[in-house]
């Protein structure tokens, strides 16, 4: 009996590392596309205007089961919707584009994890619980893994500057 082990496999488990990298890249591109899609969907709904943003946040304050402290934070955002609305729009678009192209994937995925976690907390009780929890956890997986090293700009950057923790 012979065992064929290619250089791309680990020594003990036989797991193909290239397949794992491809899987992380698919998740990265999917989460990035989700952010870009949501940006354009919300733009079309007028949710990045001060009135649209404040209306949505006030709905979450009234309808969600978020803790009182989080509702106070949401109230602050609603009261400053002229600043918060465009910031949220640019955050969603920036996270999406950076994840799609695979640039600075690890820090961007961590910011996406925090951002999606805050949205999940804001919508708590108003939507299906897994609707945002799955992308939250997927973003955390991208931050821990090296999802940008496949099909992304980070793959090129990691060849030029291998010890950098950003890719």
PLM regions and their residue ranges:
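Extended, low-polarity transmembrane helix blocks
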Residues: 1-94, 101-167
């Amino acid at each position: 009996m012979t065992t064929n082990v290619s250089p791309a496999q680990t020594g003990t488990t036989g797991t193909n590392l290239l397949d794992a990298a491809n899987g992380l890249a698919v998740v990265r591109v999917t989460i990035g596309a989700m952010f870009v899609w949501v940006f354009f969907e919300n733009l079309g709904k007028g949710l990045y205007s001060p009135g649209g943003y404040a209306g949505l946040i006030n709905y979450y304050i009234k309808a969600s089961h978020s803790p009182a402290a989080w509702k106070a934070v949401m109230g602050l955002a609603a009261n400053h919707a002229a600043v918060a609305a465009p910031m949220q729009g640019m955050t969603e678009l920036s996270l999406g584009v950076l994840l799609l192209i695979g640039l600075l994937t690890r820090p961007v995925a961590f910011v996406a994890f925090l951002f999606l976690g805050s949205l999940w907390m804001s919508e708590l009780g108003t939507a299906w619980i897994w609707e945002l929890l799955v992308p939250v956890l997927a973003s955390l997986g991208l931050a821990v893994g090296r999802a940008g090293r496949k099909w992304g700009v980070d793959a090129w950057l990691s060849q030029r500057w291998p010890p950098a923790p950003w890719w």
